[in-house]
């Protein structure tokens, strides 16, 4: 069965009201494209205020350093001015980050699978904006019998035939370490390119895994015989 290489719920990191939803369900997006845009509200003003306080703290710290050269400031005053400057710098970074987080963007190229919110909804930190699905490459998941598990390894090339579609090729990217207890088969994943996104998630597919070659002889069934114990043998003629 085919499934996405990644399926991620993209969540809000701050609280805010949705103003725009460019990441519509079914849309293909690139990494960095906007999925949800939250209202800026007072965040621009917060950034402007924090930048002004930083500039003030910087000038005060510079003034304290100038006076210290004339031995008119104590070490305590210098340390306090520096601490206030670093606090102001951190507040600027915090305000910039809060403003940037109003834009919820795609972490990778993919397809918007679900969009459980609407314009006007208020998101809290952790609320899902969209579910994003990566389908290039796409994964093919299946099972390998216990008797064949030693014949395959990660990196082996595999062919696959879609029930209603073309043949595809891929590479084994994962083999489970433990079998399914009921079937005694091991889970396996095959990664296959899907640049045109022609292979959808959830499709049934038949996989062909090449095994190691073994030399053998083809013997006609007419040459096979059973002994009195029921064992299969081959009747041969010794011309010596």
Tell what function each PLM region has:
Residues 3-6, 22, 39, 116, ...:
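A generic structural motif
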Residues 36, 142, 217-218, 235:
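Residues that recognize and position ribonucleotide moieties
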Residues 37, 143, 189-191:
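Short hydrophobic/aromatic beta-strand micro-patches
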Residues 45-58, 144-150, 172-180, 219-228:
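Short, compositionally biased
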Residues 113-114, 138, 162, 166-233:
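Structural microfeature recognizing short secondary-structure transition sites
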